[in-house]
Amino acid sequence: MIAAFFDLDGTLCTEHVWQAFNKYFTEHHRRRLLVKAFLATHLSLWPLHHLGLVSRTRFFRLWINHMPWLLVGLRPEEGQEIFRWVTDQALIPSLRPDVAEVLRQHQAQGHQVVLVSGAFEELLACLGERLGVQHVVGTRLELNRGRYSGRAIKPCFGPDKVALLTELLAKRGLEVDLSQSFSYGDSVFDVPVLEFVGNPVAVYPDRQLRDYASQRGWQIIGEPKES
């Protein structure tokens, strides 16, 4: 079978997951101190990145590793309420029409579509339901005594995306012809999944991915980002 792997933030959606969660907690007046502390601690790293004191890889890995803090102490059913709100109020409205149409074309051709993202796997499952996508690969949340611990079991980032995707394909018994399959991503951090297939597509790429894709003759969808 032929598969099509889609990244989320910046690729399928313009809204970033952390922005969507911030919007939820702000509008519902919940966990305001926790969210402010999280944003203050992590946004403050961006100037350090520009000064060369924190690598871009470390900056984004810290975000993905620490995002589960926002849900610490919540029960899974409380989490589902948040994931549904984020999906319906933030992610679905921010779908890129052209990329969503590409996804639908893959579905119409009978290709196996998989969402592959650093976002929480439970959130991706909610979005997958709305889009008719059965399989997702994301960051798995740890539970402790029936509540979210604030830690990730396995963050889904960079090369780990390929390992987790391979695990999913084997677990579900999906025999995919990778040489004929497609992958869509917007960031240089998506390169491992893009190179995993025969048809990589850079979508509204950052500068590094734009250059990387151009050198290799990959298809590019949308205007490249300048930053």
Spell out what each predicted region is.
Residues 50-66:
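Small-residue-rich anion-binding loops in enzyme active sites
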Residues 61-97:
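Metal-dependent phosphoesterase signature
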Residues 1-3, 81, 88-227:
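C-terminal cap/substrate-recognition subdomain and adjoining C-terminal extension
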Residues 15, 61, 73, 158-162:
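Electropositive phosphate-/nucleotide-binding environments in soluble metabolic enzymes
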Residues 1-55:
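Active-site neighborhood of HAD-like aspartate-dependent phosphohydrolases
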Residues 6-7, 52, 64, 84, ...:
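Residue-level detector of alpha-helix boundaries and kinks
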